[in-house]
A protein has these predicted regions:
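Oxyanion-binding/catalytic loops of NTP- or PPi-dependent enzymes
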Residues: 1-180
Length: 180
């Protein structure tokens, strides 16, 4: 989030570029506003921003030319990297290995392989994950079901953030018109 000096600097940069910056809005508001302008219908949005290391959930009401943020909730220590670590942890457990015995390089490569596995599962029913640890090659088969099982704690944390946003916004999931 921008602090005041960053907002002033952004407006000044816009002026230098010949653009009149009337207002600076946050990313969830911008996403909801962009979707709203596609339909021009009053809509209640749930903006689910799941980054590499953070989760932000916003409940945004768009009507006429107004955008109202009803609730914001988040977890600054929850993101896609947590799934990579869960996949890597499951891989190590399956092969009866412990992270503390891996070199930094081996663990970094394992995390990279876990991320590739996660990405592959977004379009494939299953994928193989291979890693060389201590000079030995290990391989595992991953499915979405396996990742769901190994990351159940992450899903529970995500649900808590979502429930908190809905409660703070005093809305039910059924009232949400669109998820961004």
């Amino acid at each position: 989030y921008f602090h005041d000096k960053q907002r002033v600097a952004t407006k000044r940069a816009g002026a230098l570029a010949g653009v009149m910056v009337k207002r600076i809005i946050n990313e969830p508001s911008a996403a909801a506003l962009a979707s709203y302008f596609d339909t021009r219908q009053e809509q209640l949005f749930l903006v689910f921003d799941f980054g590499g290391g953070t989760l932000d959930v916003s409940i945004v009401d768009c009507f006429d030319t107004m955008v109202e943020i009803l609730a914001v909730s988040g977890d600054n220590h929850l993101g896609g990297d947590d799934f990579n670590e869960a996949i890597a942890g499951g891989f190590l457990k399956e092969h009866q290995l412990q992270q503390k015995y891996l070199s930094e390089t081996e663990y970094a490569i394992l995390l990279r392989q876990a991320e590739k596995c996660k990405i592959a599962l977004s379009t494939l029913p299953e994928t193989k994950m291979t890693a060389v640890i201590g000079g030995q090659t290990y391989q595992s088969v991953y499915t979405n079901e396996r990742v769901m099982r190994e990351s159940s704690g992450i899903w529970k944390r995500m649900q808590r953030v979502l429930r908190h946003a809905l409660q703070d916004g005093r809305v039910s999931l059924e009232e949400i018109n669109a998820v961004i």
